[in-house]
Amino acid sequence: MTATTFIPPIVPADAIKLGSGRTLRFEGRDHGAAVSYFLVDNDPGQGPDLHRHPYPETWIVLEGEVRLTIGDQEFAASAGDTATAPAGVWHRFVATGTSRLRMVCIHASDVIVQEFAE
């Protein structure tokens, strides 16, 4: 029998906070999980530049409104909506409306791999 390292099941938000903002970045490999995610907390007008991943990314809008660009198509989404960008397809999102955007961005990988267009 081999010994395994126990990874605590609770990850405090402060441990995965991205920079000085409100967004959290969880990479599964660091915590014994097979998936990774961002918990986005953006003000209107904020969002990442155009990028892609070698795996699908699924978004779940928890609060607020967002404009998603997937390939050459744009979609409006709001609280309760779910959308997925296929692997290898350029995409981005921008918080719209008048309130903050809270959204879970699920990466189907234990590490987050991003290639930006510029």
State what each model feature region is.
Residues 72-88:
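Short acidic-glycine-tyrosine-enriched beta hairpin
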Residues 21-23, 37-53, 87:
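Conserved short histidine dyad/triad with adjacent acidic residue
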Residues 50, 68-69, 85, 91-98, ...:
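Short beta-strand His + acidic residue motifs that chelate non-heme Fe in jelly-roll/DSBH
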